[in-house]
């Protein structure tokens, strides 16, 4: 059986005998060593998780390039992508897999899998907020963080105005990436910078790559981790 076939046709976790899965283990470890070297070298043993619909102990999946927002408005989705572009980021809200080092957080979206990029990858994260939508959109403090990144002229225009994202004028100012100061944005949004810090922070990490390898978190801990 070819590796791809094996990865796509593994057993359900509740039916697998981990102690008798040596063949699968050897093939998964070999696949990681042959195809995931950039991540292994950059992460230095750290892992991130993604919550996905269960599909076996290990499988590969193409990363979507056309993701649409589910938890936020299209305007905020486009704003976040625009801010990422300001700092030269490649991984954004449209073309990335969303990951976290907090397994429990990943489990709110599905079964927890260790996510490992196959081949080259890019990533974006923020040291200032853990969840972009929750921390920037759902409360007044988040709105203040956005205002703080505006360029001087736009910020002055709003200085004496009650900032209300439901007010048409202030909302249009806030959602336009052209109104932001790139140097200020770069303090809060890191593109391809400090991956180990990103993982250690437990914050949301967007990873852009062609393909992602997913490994059941229990199988990874019990069998795979000590070999990679």
Predicted ranges, named:
Residues 11-22, 36, 117-228:
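Active-site and NAD+-binding cores of ADP-ribose-processing enzymes
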Residues 44-46, 57, 81-156:
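ADP-ribosyltransferase catalytic core
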Residues 28-41, 99-104, 191-194, 201:
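Intrinsically disordered, low-complexity boundary segments flanking structured domains
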Residues 7-92, 208-210, 216-228:
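ADP-ribose/NAD+-binding catalytic cleft of ART/PARP-like enzymes
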Residues 1-7:
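Enriched but not universal
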